[in-house]
Amino acid sequence: DVEGVPAALYDSTFSLQKDVLYYKIREYAAACRANKMEETAMEASKVYYTDFRCPVGTSLLDKLRRVCIAAGIKDIDMDGKFVAIKMHFGELGNLAFLRPNYAKVVADLCKEQGGLPFLTDCNTLYPGSRKNALEHLTCAQLNGFWPMTTGCQVIIADGLRGTDEAEVPVPNGEYCKTAKIGRAIMDADIFISLTHFKGHESTGFGGTLKNIGMGCGSRAGKMIQHAAGHPEVQQSLCRGCHRCAKECGSDAITYDANNKAVIDQTKCKGCGRCIGACNFDAIYSQCDSANEMLDRKMAEYAAAVCAGRPCFHVSLVQDISPNCDCHCENDAPILPDIGIFAS
């Protein structure tokens, strides 16, 4: 339960943000462990960790390689197999996304084992530089992701318009029976997620699960996950700046005679971009259960992506910005850099 974290992320004092986020993460991790042990009786995977301290002669890239090897990436049979490395290429203007140097370390490890790696992501629901494959590829290149820097190609998994998808079953799905995933991701023999931890206006925070569950969904898949609830406007707080309307990819926001924002619920897709766009906290989710439902659907989508094939996960806890890398800006980190996790 991450209730309360989104509001804290918008608070003006970083000390409050840090305290709330820290304890919510602890609560969430404890609940996950308890749920996993009690309901599924599964043994938790070992997670390997290294900090960001680097003695002379050792780089962060060296440490990333070592922690990946320690966590077992070389135990995966990759010979002649396609390896999807799922990551976020960053919206243009955002500088909190993972550097392409990290992607090259993972891609090189795959190639050393005979694998055929490619970097991948799916298109977005909202306006920006990643709403179709052509602009998405241009964005990735401008942010440094191309073969000369990463050692492998970039493929936008759900195609030109975000409609190239595979509908796959969700194992024991309670909220989604099937998941609509970018086809190139499901065509891969092996799946690797490469992400960094950060805040998020709807889910509280985002990391590996969000990178997989929401990130691998096609446009239709993203809409299904967001469909649990739509935002509303507290008009007394609205300043009529029109930022929310510029961010809306569904043309769902108009303005009344008093220049106050109004959301057409029949057009709204529930993506939450307007919530992050508003600097005055005038737009909010109708109920906490909507975000809770989003979290659960996202987890089920992640399960569908990973089921039935070898998977490996890398999460760098650095550049912990208040919002996700989908924004065209990034605020100062709300926590110091911590380290690298791999499993």
Language model features with spans:
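Generic low-complexity segments that are intrinsically disordered, proline-rich and/or Lys/Arg-biased
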Residues: A7, K18, Y23, V56, ...
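Short, positively charged and aromatic/hydrophobic N-terminal segments
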Residues: Y10-T13, Q17-E38
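Exposed boundary/loop context
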Residues: G4, D19, G206-T208
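Extreme N-terminal basic, low-complexity initiation segments
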Residues: V2-Y10
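Hydrophobic pocket-lining residues that define ligand/cofactor binding sites across diverse proteins
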Residues: C110
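Extended, low-polarity segments enriched in aliphatic/aromatic residues
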Residues: E43-Y102, Q113-D121, Y126-S343
